[in-house]
Regions:
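N-terminus-centered regions that define maturation/targeting leaders and the start
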Residues: 16-206
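Bacterial N-terminal signal peptides
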Residues: 5-14
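Generic detector of short alpha-helix boundary/capping microenvironments
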Residues: 4-5, 48
């Protein structure tokens, strides 16, 4: 019996090592490598307090159709607070990791890219993508190759939409409007903290 028990130990350890990693916090210091992969280091107290919300929908709640392709594709109002000290600008990325089918996701679809949002900014008004951004803020290219917000338009099922704001210790400069990948590469080593809001959407059945 002792031999059997000892033999089981490696099996149990192997099983534990194959379990899914614990999800990272949605706030803290994020480092983005050149491949666009983000890793998270120990956050400062101010970074841990950083948060983003929207008056349009609750965290993990359903996004109203007004803000989707079935409505007017209006960008929702976003608000954030308790940004880390030393913030020189904010960047915003909105994407959908469930494309095209949440049961078999194959890619992350990018809906909005904004950068050089002034450090004193604490919110973006509704429809900010169409002339309502603060002075100095610029829009990058989404996956429709447009410099604006493109609302949720999932072909299959209910998708998640991640609204991610990053506090940076610098402004960013690009020769041409950046993609999400361009922005993530430029942010590498400059992220003081980040906050995340998730909304969901599924097209109305006809």
């Amino acid at each position: 019996m002792r031999a059997i028990a000892i033999a089981l130990i490696p099996v149990m350890l192997a099983a534990c090592s194959k379990s899914e990693p614990r999800p990272s916090s949605d706030t803290g210091v994020v480092t983005v490598d050149t491949a666009g992969n983000a890793s998270q280091s120990t956050p400062s107290p101010s970074a841990m307090a950083f948060k983003i919300t929207s008056p349009a929908f609750a965290p993990s709640g359903s996004i109203p159709s007004k803000y989707t392709c079935e409505g007017s594709d209006t960008s929702p109002s976003l608000e954030w607070s308790d940004a880390p000290s030393g913030t020189k600008s904010f960047a915003l990325i909105v994407d959908d990791p469930d494309a095209p089918d949440p049961a078999k996701p194959q890619r992350t679809y990018v809906h909005w890219v904004v950068y050089n949002i002034p450090p004193g900014t604490t919110k973006l008004p509704e429809n900010a993508a169409k002339g309502g951004l603060p002075s100095g803020a610029l829009q990058g290219r989404n996956d429709w190759k447009k410099q604006t917000y493109g609302g949720p338009c999932p072909p299959i099922g209910r998708h998640r939409y991640f609204f991610k704001v990053y506090a940076l210790d610098t402004d960013l400069t690009f020769a041409s409007p950046p993609t999400k990948a361009d922005l993530e590469k430029a942010m590498q080593g400059h992220v003081l903290g980040n906050a995340e809001l998730i909304g969901t959407y599924e097209k109305a059945r006809k």
